[in-house]
Amino acid sequence: MERAEKREFVTELNEVFKASGSVVVAHYAGVTVAQMNDFRSKMRAAGGTVKVAKNRLAKIALQGTESEGMTNLFKGQTLIAYSVDPMIAPKVVMDFAKTNDKVVVLGGSMGATTLNAEAVKSLATLPSLDELRAKLLGLLNAPATRVATVVAAPASQLARVFSAYAKKDEAA
């Protein structure tokens, strides 16, 4: 890479660190090209991105961002996975790490919070924003459904009473 290309790459990576909801850093030594391509396609399908950058350039790109606290993670062969949705990158990376023992999660960041490997693992177990929205809508709809059931119940009970009286009169 020439100096101008490096400057452009650092600027681009700096924007990524500023705009991402979450960033995960992991070692990938020993991962084959096919496995890496599979990982990248899974991340892309979920709405995230995977980049491999020189550690020195990544550290420079971190300067002036909220994620600056994770500069110590960039040692060895590292990859950077990021997404706008804070739950996507940790989930996809942890799923890939389960099937491929050569991927070792080092940590990451979520906004201004620097995460260690355990925090990334626990973040991956949380439901996504869409799942949380669905649960919230379900909770909001439940009382309305119950109210409709309660309002309809007296009318149906009254109808059963009239039906019972009608059958009683017919039998007599």
UniProtKB/Swiss-Prot annotation:
Give UniProt keywords alphabetically: Ribonucleoprotein, Ribosomal protein, RNA-binding, rRNA-binding
Q: Origin, by domain of life?
A: Bacteria
The record's SUPFAM superfamilies line, in alphabetical order, gives: Ribosomal protein L10-like
* Pfam families xrefs: Ribosomal_L10
Q: Which GO annotations describe the biological process of this protein?
A: translation
Keyword field contains Transport: no
Q: Which family does it belong to?
A: Belongs to the universal ribosomal protein uL10 family.
Which CDD domains does its entry note?
Answer: Ribosomal_L10
The protein, known as: Large ribosomal subunit protein uL10
* Keyword Heme listed: no
Q: Name one GO cellular component term.
A: large ribosomal subunit
